[in-house]
Amino acid sequence: MKALIFAAGLGTRLRPLTDDRPKALVEVAGRPLLQHVVDSLKRQGVDEIVINVHHFADQIIDYVEHKGGFGLKVHISDEREQLLDTGGGILKARRWLEGSEPFIVHNADILTDIDLRAMYSSHIASRADVTLLVASRVTSRYLLFNTDRRLCGWINKSTGQTLPEGVEYAPGVYSELAFGGVHVISPSIFPYLERFSREQKFSITPFYVANCDSLNIVGWLQPVGTGWLDVGKKESLSAAESMFG
């Protein structure tokens, strides 16, 4: 099983911790976030990973080498020249992720004990092109799903912005679910990504919404009783220490 770890971000929400290191190397319970994510993916059967890098890229590359590649097959997707955002990051890593099997995409600042093998199996069983980890959680931005939990749109409750732009979503018609920073993706999306990308840098969310009629993009609900934390912000670090220490 393959996985792409997003480790290229600037980590602005974690400053000043990220003034001298990449977000992926900020420590929780004595181990970098990257190590937590890699260990979790290894336990769940991942044997090949791609790590994208930009901010303090050399530190991540040195860490991977120091760890002997974590005992995995590791590829570095180098974005030092330009940070490509999530959609551009997936497309740049295409050469390592193409094939017949789906792959996992996991943010480096997401810590969870969710059984991603169950999510992966659900993805295959449903014949989805993309499966997104989602939860009923208070946030400002929501993915919108129909009764079959198929993606239909996106809304920012703070600004009123919607995707597709200008669409007015009637209250109560769609399930509003928060995205959890983990995707399972089938390589079937790559031709669609190529056609969508006018520039190298682009976000994956507008792509998903623009293609939700053509691709089977579904939500997979976080199981009750499982742990999940976005450690991309300082206020979550102490909670992460308690949960994963």
Residue ranges and their predicted role:
Residues 2-5, 27, 31-107, 116-118, ...:
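Conserved N-terminal catalytic core of the sugar/cofactor nucleotidyltransferase
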Residues 14, 60-64, 193, 240:
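Hydrophobic packing residues within well-ordered alpha-helices of enzyme cores
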Residues 1-19, 44:
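N-terminal nucleotide-binding beta1-loop-alpha1 segment
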Residues 126-136, 141:
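A short, conserved acidic/glycine-rich loop-to-beta-strand motif
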Residues 101-104, 111, 117-124, 137-138, ...:
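Catalytic-core segments of class I nucleotidyltransferases/pyrophosphorylases
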Residues 10, 108-110:
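Active-site metal-binding loops of divalent metal-dependent hydrolases
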